[in-house]
Regions:
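Periplasmic polypeptide-binding modules associated with outer-membrane biogenesis and secretion
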Residues: 27-228, 240, 257-265, 407, ...
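Repeated loop/turn-to-beta-strand initiation elements of outer-membrane beta-barrel proteins
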Residues: 193, 218-220, 247-253, 277-283, ...
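Transmembrane beta-strand segments that form the barrel wall of outer-membrane beta-barrel proteins
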Residues: 197, 218-228, 239-240, 250-261, ...
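Transmembrane beta-strands of outer-membrane beta-barrel pores
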Residues: 226-228, 245, 257-261, 286-292, ...
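Outer-membrane beta-barrel translocator domains and adjoining extracellular loop/strand segments
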Residues: 266-270, 293-300, 337-346, 385-394, ...
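Transmembrane beta-strand segments of outer-membrane beta-barrel domains in Gram-negative
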Residues: 274, 281-424, 428-430
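C-terminal transmembrane beta-barrel domains of outer membrane proteins
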Residues: 393-548
Length: 548
């Protein structure tokens, strides 16, 4: 009888926990994000560029004549803004000039074309007699002559030539195609790739010599931050080691670890390789996270693990100095286990999930107006299956079992405000087809969200996050001061949480180390998911790391 009563009470307590546990985040859900994401952007990026060694026109004839009209003869393949070209020509029409002045006009038109997608274009004066003041100016786009390789790196010639195979002799030299090839070489090899243009053997052609010089064969980073959750350890310490161009064909290996000051451990390894010659990559990764809950809930004996196997890849559509677009895709398998020892095997939650995802990512830069736009869009379809009795009870109560779809979007815009300031606007959001398992939810509180609230606060199936941040670049190189406003809104079923806050930050970036500190205060109080929120109006965040 006593044993029966014990099981009855235990079952009642567990059922009482269902409502709160199904709606609340898993204790370590905020640590299930992409490993190493807090240090993204701190490692060196691709290095590529185009140099033009073709000579400018020169003339010493100072005989003046009146220019009444300029006829621009452009090959059909060249596309540019007619209004901008017209403004350049109108500055010369109706005025006296010399042959040197016309050569200067040629250089202006040439520079315009080269900065607008045709790096080998050239304007020139064909043989003509201009007795009536009418001048004919021709523009040729520049076509590939010989494409040569000067490889002084560990990246194998065969791999490099594969990227250059699309630069065919006789075709128009376009910035987008040439820089995409150069940046893709740099992305995979870790080397610096520069294309040098020189005069070709025949009129209207340019030879291209691609120089590849070795970069760092590997990089390492160690860092410390306090971006963790309260129950599993706010202070965390991480390390990551990346090896580039492992086999001379562009493959890459990343190994990393993250541990907290309490009882969270996260380890990951991935391998990425080049597939074909178009820059398509395919990788495989494995990560394992384990945790134990501390604090007021420690008496429950809550602990768990998450094992994730990922297959992922990308395909560049184009990549230049000022714009990039790439397709991304992947598959994830997760096995999740969450136990509460205080209730025995009845509180063991075991589940697994599969998902496939595809999206686009890239950036666009408007140098003239000082604007930079980064974007990332992902669509995910998956299935979550409960593997234990307690997990099935949770899934039934919350409606999280079975198939789901979700869409995620992130957009960041940076507008320059003179030489020492800019304003950054960040927007992100998630939409879902149903109530999601906690491993698939978003959260709106934390170091990379509304910074006035703890990590993982405001979890939801769908929601939006926004930040407006003013940044001032001080006279100390690399030191940036900022002030910002964060806001987020998330919802689960009919329950909605809104969080707002403001703060100040100080960041320092050098070639081999980085640091950032933030102090944020909440505005009002969102639906209190944690008692500590109502007690603490301000929060302090830091991140610091060293790169080798």
């Amino acid at each position: 009888m006593k044993n029966k009563l014990h099981h009855t009470l235990t079952r009642a307590v567990l059922l009482g926990l269902l409502a709160s546990t199904a709606a609340a985040p898993a204790y370590a859900a905020s640590s299930l994000s992409k490993p190493g994401q807090d240090i993204e952007g701190t490692l060196p990026g691709a290095e590529a560029g185009v140099e033009n060694n073709m000579k400018k026109n020169t003339a010493t004839n100072e005989v003046k004549f009146l220019v009444k009209n300029i006829q621009l003869d452009v090959e059909d393949e060249i596309k540019f803004n007619n209004a901008e070209i017209r403004d350049i020509l109108l500055a010369r029409i109706g005025k006296e000039t010399t042959l040197a002045g016309l050569n200067d006009l040629q250089d202006q038109i040439t520079a315009y074309c080269r900065s607008h997608g045709y790096p080998a274009a050239a304007a020139y004066l064909p043989a003509q007699e201009s007795k009536d003041g009418n001048v004919i100016l021709k523009v040729i786009p520049g076509r590939y002559g010989d494409v040569k390789l000067d490889n002084k790196s560990r990246f194998k010639d065969a791999a490099a030539k594969g990227f250059l195979a699309g630069l065919k002799k006789g075709e128009i030299i376009r910035t987008k195609d040439l820089e995409t090839a150069l940046y893709t070489i740099s992305d995979f090899s870790g080397a610096r790739a520069v294309g040098t243009l020189s005069a070709g053997k025949s009129f209207g052609t340019s030879d291209v010599t691609v120089h590849i010089e070795d970069g760092k064969p590997s990089s390492s980073i160690v860092y410390a931050e306090n971006y963790g959750g309260e129950s599993t350890g706010r202070y965390r310490y991480g390390a990551q080691h990346s090896i580039y161009n492992v086999d001379g064909m562009g493959s890459k290996v990343n190994v990393g670890a993250l541990i907290s000051n309490k009882s969270l451990h996260n380890y990951y390894v991935n391998y990425e390789a080049l597939v074909g010659h178009g820059g398509t990559s395919l990788g495989i990764g494995y990560s394992r996270m384990d945790y134990e809950v501390s604090g007021p809930l420690k008496r429950l004996g809550a602990h768990g693990t998450a094992d994730t196997i990922s297959v992922y890849g990308s395909r560049p559509i184009y990549h230049t100095t000022d714009e990039k677009l790439a397709l991304t895709y992947g598959y994830d398998y997760r096995r999740l286990k969450d136990d509460m020892d205080a209730f025995g095997a009845q509180a063991d939650s075991k589940k697994h999930s599969h998902d496939i995802h595809a999206g686009v990512e890239g950036f666009w830069r408007d140098r003239k107006n000082g604007l930079l736009l980064n974007y990332n869009f992902v669509l995910t379809a998956g299935n979550v299956t409960a593997d234990s009795t307690y997990a099935r009870q949770l899934a039934k109560s919350g409606g999280t079992d079975g198939g789901f779809t979700k869409a995620e979007a992130k957009v960041t815009a940076v507008q320059s405000l003179g030489k020492q300031a800019d304003v950054m606007v960040k927007l992100s959001g998630q939409a879902a087809s149903k109530h999601l398992d906690s491993s698939e939810q978003m959260y709106i509180g934390g170091a990379n969200a509304v910074r006035a609230y703890p990590q993982g606060a405001g979890t939801g199936d769908k929601g939006m996050l926004g930040t407006v941040e003013f940044r001032y670049y001080t006279d100390v190189p690399g030191l940036v001061a900022s002030t910002y406003f964060d806001a987020g809104r998330s919802s689960i079923d009919n329950s909605t949480t809104t969080l707002k806050g403001w703060g100040v930050g100080l960041a320092y970036n050098a070639p081999d180390w980085f640091a950032r500190v933030d102090y944020a205060r909440r505005i009002g109080l969102g639906r209190a998911l944690y008692d500590s929120i109502s007690k603490d109006r301000g929060r302090f965040w830091f991140l610091a790391g060293k790169i080798w």
